[in-house]
Amino acid sequence: MKPTSLPKNFTNNPAPKAVTGFKLDNGRAYRKLNEAWPVYEPLDSTKDGKGKDKDGWTTSGASEPKGDAPLVSSTGSQMSAVTDSQQSGHNSGLVSLAQRSTTVAVQKSDSSGFQGQGTTDNKFQKYLNTAQALHQMGVIVPSLETWPGKPSTGIATRAGGGVSVQAATRQSSSTNEDLPNVITQLYHTSTSQLAYLNGQIVVMGSNAVPSLWYWVVDERTTSGSATWWAKTHLNFGTEVQKSFVENQLGFKDDSNSDSKNSNLKAQDLTQPAYLITGLDVVQDHLVFAAFKAGAVGYDMTTDSNASTKDQALAWSTTAGLDSAGGYNNLVENTAGLNGPINDLFTLLDTFAYVTPVSGMKGGSQNNEEVQTKYPVKDDSKASAKIASLINASPLNSYGDDGVTVFDALGLNFNFKLDEARLPSRTDQLLVYGIVNESELKSARENAQSTSDDNSNTKVKWTKPPRTTSPCRITTVPISPKRVTEEERSSGNH
C-alpha cells in the first residue's frame, strides 16, 4: 500500500528555527543490528548554552526528582511477550498501544532505596515516571534490579512493528547513584535510531527530535501549576545537560524562570519536544508517528472524592487550535508550532484524539477545567486551559480504531474511537511524517556540510568510515560498464 498523497497546499511547509539541538560528532551514522549502540552527549546548539545557570538549580531542584520518582519494573510475562514478538519477526506497521499493552509494577523510592507509597494501580502521590509509557511504546526497559553497578551492552532488536532497544547503562563513578542513568538510555534509544530499513537501523539525529526524554512532573497541590523536572544525574556535562533539558521541555515555574530562559523567551514560546511513538518502513520509506510533548496538565478539582484529584491528566501542545484553522496554523507556523523536522520530513497529516470530558473529569459536576501552562504564547501562559483529556496513542500506518490513553498519565482507559465525541479543539497533535532513501542521503550530506558550531538548524554528522559503506543508505546508479558486463554474461550482448 502506498502512502497517501499530500493534502493540498502542504508542499511548502517550512520548519521553525530550533533553539536546542544534538551534535553527533563521533561514531558512525548507521549501526548494524548486532552492534553496540554508542552514547552521544546531547549539547545545547548555542554551544555555551543559555538555559538555567548553575545558581538556578538548587540542591532540592536537582535531587528531589531522583529521590521521589516511582520505579517501574517489568514482569516476566511482559518480557516473554516481547521476546516472542521479536522472534516472530512481526512487521505489520505501527502497532497501537492497545496491542502492545504490558503489565508493570510501580514502586516509590528515595535516593537511599527506601520504598515509598507508590501503588500498583498507577496512582502517584508526587512524581510521574515515563518508564510505563516506554513499555507501552515497545521500548524494552530491563528490570531495575539488574541495573545498579552492572553496565551492559545495548542491543537493538526488532519488536512489535518498530525497533526497540535493550539499552545499556553507563558505569557510574558516583557512590550515590543507586538508580540507572535513565536519560542516557533514553537519549540513545531515541536519537540514535529511527527505524529498520533494508536490514539496517537508520540512524538520524535532529535538533527537533529529542524524543523519549525521562521526565517527572510535580503534582503537589500547593504548586498551583504544572512544573517540569528532568532526571539529570549524569556522568558528563551535568550543567550542560540540565540547560539542554530545561530548554527543550520548558522552564521550571519559579520567579526566576523567564529571565533565565532567554532562548525560549525570545520566541515567547517554550519549545515542545517530539515523542516518537511509532516507527515503520512502508515500501522503502521511513514512516514515523510522533506527538509533541508540551505540558502535562493535572486535575485542579477541589473535590477530594474525585478519582482524578491531583493526578497528571494530559499532554497539551497547542492552545486553541480549531479544526478549521488548525492545519493552516501548523503549516504557516504562525502559532509557534514545530513543522516538519528541518524540512527533511514531509508532513502527511495531523490527528487529534481526545477522551470525552463527561465521566472522566474530577469534580461533582464534571465541569472543572484541567489547567496547563506550556507551551503557549508568553502573554497567555498563565490563563491557558484545556477542557478535555488528550489521547497519546499512535495509530498504525493505515489507521487504527483502538485508542489507549497513556497509563503513565494515571489514566487507564481503553475505548473504541467514537467520532461523535471529538470536539473541534485540538490540543494534541499527532504528526505523521515520511522520508525516502534519497532524502535520508541528502539530509546526511546537508548536515555534514554544516561548519557552524552554533548552528540552530542542522545537525553535524561525522562521516562514517569507508569500511562501513555497506551500512550506509545510498542510491548507486548502475554504470554502463556494469550493464555491458551483465549483458555479456547473460548472452544478450
Swiss-Prot record:
Region (Disordered): 1-92, 441-493
Biased composition regions of type Polar residues, renumbered to the chain: 1-14, 72-92, 445-472
Compositional bias of kind Basic and acidic residues: 25-34, 44-56, 482-493
Xref: InterPro entries: MgpC
Record-stated family: Belongs to the MgpC family.
UniProt name for this protein: Putative MgpC-like protein MPN_414
Species, as recorded: Mycoplasma pneumoniae (strain ATCC 29342 / M129 / Subtype 1)
